[in-house]
Each structure stands twice: as C-alpha cells, then as structure tokens.
Curated annotation (Swiss-Prot):
<dbReference type="GO" id="GO:0005886">
    <property type="term" value="C:plasma membrane"/>
</dbReference>
<keyword id="KW-0066">ATP synthesis</keyword>
<keyword id="KW-0997">Cell inner membrane</keyword>
<keyword id="KW-0406">Ion transport</keyword>
<dbReference type="InterPro" id="IPR003593">
    <property type="entry name" value="AAA+_ATPase"/>
</dbReference>
<comment type="similarity">
    <text>Belongs to the ATPase alpha/beta chains family.</text>
</comment>
<dbReference type="InterPro" id="IPR004100">
    <property type="entry name" value="ATPase_F1/V1/A1_a/bsu_N"/>
</dbReference>
<dbReference type="GO" id="GO:0005524">
    <property type="term" value="F:ATP binding"/>
</dbReference>
<keyword id="KW-0375">Hydrogen ion transport</keyword>
<keyword id="KW-0813">Transport</keyword>
<comment type="function">
    <text>Produces ATP from ADP in the presence of a proton gradient across the membrane. The catalytic sites are hosted primarily by the beta subunits.</text>
</comment>
<keyword id="KW-1003">Cell membrane</keyword>
<dbReference type="InterPro" id="IPR050053">
    <property type="entry name" value="ATPase_alpha/beta_chains"/>
</dbReference>
<keyword id="KW-0472">Membrane</keyword>
<dbReference type="GO" id="GO:0016887">
    <property type="term" value="F:ATP hydrolysis activity"/>
</dbReference>
<dbReference type="InterPro" id="IPR036121">
    <property type="entry name" value="ATPase_F1/V1/A1_a/bsu_N_sf"/>
</dbReference>
<comment type="subunit">
    <text>F-type ATPases have 2 components, CF(1) - the catalytic core - and CF(0) - the membrane proton channel. CF(1) has five subunits: alpha(3), beta(3), gamma(1), delta(1), epsilon(1). CF(0) has four main subunits: a(1), b(1), b'(1) and c(9-12).</text>
</comment>
Length: 474
C-alpha cells in the first residue's frame, strides 16, 4: 500500500496539524514534508478526530503553509546505527551536521524502542574508576549504572563530563555516545575539536574513532530537544546489542529533555502540573531511563548532567531524575566560590556502591571518616563565624585544620581545564586515593600547610609542593 498523504491545516509554532482523508498515521509515526528544499520531519503526538493529527516539528516550521502535502512514513523516526556513525555528528533525525557527507550505515533503527526484559538485565555491581579523587573515594560510579551530575548554572557540569570522557573514553576499550540535549552550540563545537585533539575522533580514519555525537542544541525547536536523547540512546543500544560492548552514554543536559517536554506539552494544550511541568514528567523520564540498562550481552554506563534550576534540588525535574540513579555527584556553588574544583559536594553526593561488601572495608571506612570530619567542620562553621577559632577546643581546632586540608585535597587539576589552571591534568589511582586520605585522616600530615593540598594529585605531590613552598618562603 502506498504511504498515506495528508495536507497541513494549521501551523502554530512547532505544532503542525495535518488532515488525512483515508489512512490515519499512528501516534509517534514520522511524517515527512518539504520545507525550503529540505526534508522536514513531523512526529504524530495526538489524534484530534475527523482525520486530523497534531504533530511536533523536528526542525523550524517557518515557511510551512496550509494545504501543503505531508507523507506518512508508516513508522517512527529512524536514525542510522552501527560503526558508520563513529566520529560523526548527527541531528535528531539522523542527518549528519558535520559537513562530512552521508553516513555510511547499513542499518537504521526507530528511536522508540522497548526497554530490555527484566530477565535479560544484568545486576552485577562493579566500580568504574574515573581517576577523579572525590568521585572515586566518596561516591564511586558503577559500571553499567546511571550517574547524575547535579548543579546550577556555571558550577562545572560540562567540564566534569568532558573530563570523564577524556579519562574513561581514552582508557575504555568500548565506544561512547554523546547526546548534546539543548546545550550551548559553542560547547558542542569545543567538544568536537577536543575529541579530535585527544585522538578519540580520527577524522582521517573515522572507523577508528571511539565516539558518536548527536546534537540537539539550545536554538533548535522543542521537538528536536525532546527526542535527541532517544536518538543517542538508540545508537548506544545498537552498540551494546550488536557487539556486546560496554558503552558509555553521556547526556548533557537531561534537564533540557524535561524542559523541552514541558514546552511541547504546553503547545499540545495539556494542563501543566507542579511548577508548570508536563503532567507526564515521571512517565517521560521513566520511559527513557528504563532503556539505559545493562543486559547479559553488554552494558550501557550513562553519565547525565542535570541542571538544577535556581540551585533547588527539590524542583520536580531534578527530583524525578534522582529516583533513577545509582550514583549522584552534586556540584555546589559554595565550594566553587572557594575556588575548589571539581566543586563536588562531599556530603551531598552519594552512591549505591558505597557498601563494604562492594568497595571493601578499608575504602568504606576511609570514606566515612572523611565525611565525618567534613560534617563536624560544617557544624562548627556557625560558631567560628560568630566567636572565632580561638573559642574552639583543641580537639575541634585539629578537626577544622584537617577538614580544610581534606577539602583542598579533594580538588584536582583536569586535562580539559588546562586553559584555566595552567597545569596538566592528573588521574589518581584508586589505591593511592584511599591510602592518601587514610593518612590525612590519621593526622600523619598535620605538619604540612593546607595550601600544599590544593590542586594536586597524590600525597607525594603534596609533600613536594610543601617543600617547594618552604624553600620559596626561605
């Protein structure tokens, strides 16, 4: 049967109504039309009755006119998948946007897939070492798990994601997929060129590249921003299922997925729920997050940046995301104001792996001791602010001194932030991190100045920096 053809009856921004006289397209079907000489994809969102469907445009709808013909593709939006996508940048409908010619892919997949059956999912717990001290020590990431990076505007989510790509994608033998959801075009461009510089993308021999990129940037219509995460996820699922690989799936930023869903929901005339979000917020998030999982064939480890509106973690968007995560890394403005980067909050960040049966007794105990000292310091800060340090007991003075050293020791220079710090990035082995913090907690380095602990790797560098500071002072 020939694909059904309909006519546009109404255009309101990103929402386009199309009337079909015979065969009505199903919900989530992709429709195609010509706009300004380019293919425009519309996704069916509602059946309005009398042969009319309401659709969401995946690109700008400027230039569309009533009466224009639209063809039903008889299936969902599809994207190219497989090795041909490596080193390429695709948009939401799988078209290349890197001016590198057509994508050499043998297979296309629909972006709406069912999550794997429960019986097929893997439940093993294994630590994914990142080389970032504060993460590995206090809120370790799980291989095949979901990790959230929470933070307000400008506290370093994208820098942390780029460092994780740098640290893990380089040493990681599998492939990675990066979904840029509603973020800055400049950051997307910077990321692409950084990938080329670091050898993760090989422009002269694309099959050797280790990452595929899908972008739906801030300036794109809400339909594209809402579906781009699913396009990226479809690529990641194919790598996992076809090759049995361990896939890294980066999303920057998952909040924009929710935000775009909220815009689309309002355009479709749904009654908003709390704080103006769409009534289907939990369903939209759950449908996507359930697909990001590890099966017995391979794993998808997902690292998601989550923008926190007005630094309010109780906002429905970040709160809904929390429920799906194995580990949360919370970035704090108060810590970034102290100049400590990565600005990870050691007391707010958590991980399901922080269990002695998984990480071992020594790691668990050191992490709890570090958090205990930092928590005591936090509770003493009001007293210090009002009465000053002199009013504290000797024991509390020692706790404060150690806490300030620990706080600075949790900072670390990043490869991707070399432009800002002027020093090369350092990755620290997990064993070194544990032994270093164990010694600091035990008071073995109480004699060293706290400045020596700032922006260094292991404890050997602290000692070297302290000696240099002493020599400079003399």
């Amino acid at each position: 049967m020939a694909n059904a053809v309909g006519k546009i009856t109404q255009v309101i921004g990103a929402v386009v109504d199309v009337q079909f006289n015979d065969h009505l397209p199903e919900i989530l079907n992709a429709l195609e039309t010509e706009n300004d000489g380019k293919r425009l994809v519309l996704e069916v969102a509602q059946h309005l009755g009398e042969g009319t469907v309401r659709t969401i445009a995946m690109d700008s709808s400027e230039g569309l006119v009533r009466g224009q013909e639209v063809t039903d593709t008889d299936g969902p939006i599809t994207v190219p998948v497989g090795p041909g996508t490596l080193g390429r940048i695709l948009n939401v409908v799988g078209e290349p946007v890197d001016e590198g010619g057509p994508v050499d892919a043998e297979e296309r997949r629909g972006i709406h897939q069912d999550a794997p059956e429960f019986a097929d999912q893997s439940t093993e717990a294994e630590v994914l070492v990142t080389g970032i001290k504060v993460v590995d020590l206090l809120a370790p990431y799980s291989k095949g798990g979901k990790i959230g990076l929470f933070g307000g505007a400008g506290v370093g989510k994208t820098v942390l994601i780029m460092e994780l790509i740098n640290n893990i994608a380089k040493v990681h033998s599998g492939v990675s997929v990066f979904a840029g959801v509603g973020e800055r075009t400049r950051e997307g461009n910077d990321l692409y060129h950084e990938m080329i510089e670091s050898g993760v993308i090989v422009p002269d021999n694309l099959p050797e590249s280790k990452i595929a990129l899908v972008y739906g940037q801030m300036n794109e219509p809400p339909g594209a921003r809402m579906r781009i995460a699913l396009s990226g996820l479809t690529l990641a699922e194919q790598f996992r299922d076809a090759t049995g690989a361990d896939v890294l799936f980066f999303i920057d930023n998952i909040f924009r997925f929710t935000q775009a869903g909220s815009e689309v929901s309002a355009l479709l005339g749904r009654i908003p729920s709390a704080v103006g979000y769409q009534p289907t917020l939990a369903t939209d998030m759950g449908t996507m997050q359930e697909r990001i999982t590890s099966t017995k064939r391979g794993s998808i480890t997902s690292i998601q940046a989550v923008y926190v509106p007005a630094d309010d973690l109780t906002d429905p968007a970040p709160a809904t995301t929390f429920a799906h995560l194995d580990a949360t890394t919370v970035l704090s403005r108060a810590i970034s104001e102290l100049g400590i980067y990565p600005a990870v909050d050691p007391l707010d960040s958590s991980s399901r792996l922080m269990d002695p049966t998984i990480v071992g007794d020594e790691h668990y105990q050191v992490a709890r001791d570090v958090q205990g000292i930092l928590q005591r310091y936090k509770s003493l800060q009001d007293i210090i602010a009002i009465l000053g340090m002199d009013e504290l007991s000797e024991e509390d003075k020692l706790t404060v001194a150690r806490a300030r050293k620990i706080q600075r020791f949790l900072s670390q220079p990043f490869d991707v932030a070399k432009v800002f710090t002027g020093s090369d990035g350092i990755q620290v082995q997990l064993e070194d991190t544990i032994s270093s913090f164990k010694a600091v907690v035990a008071g073995e380095y109480d004699h060293l100045p706290e400045g020596a602990f700032y922006m260094v790797g292991g404890i050997d560098e602290v000692i070297a920096k302290a000696e240099k500071m002493a020599a400079d002072a003399a």
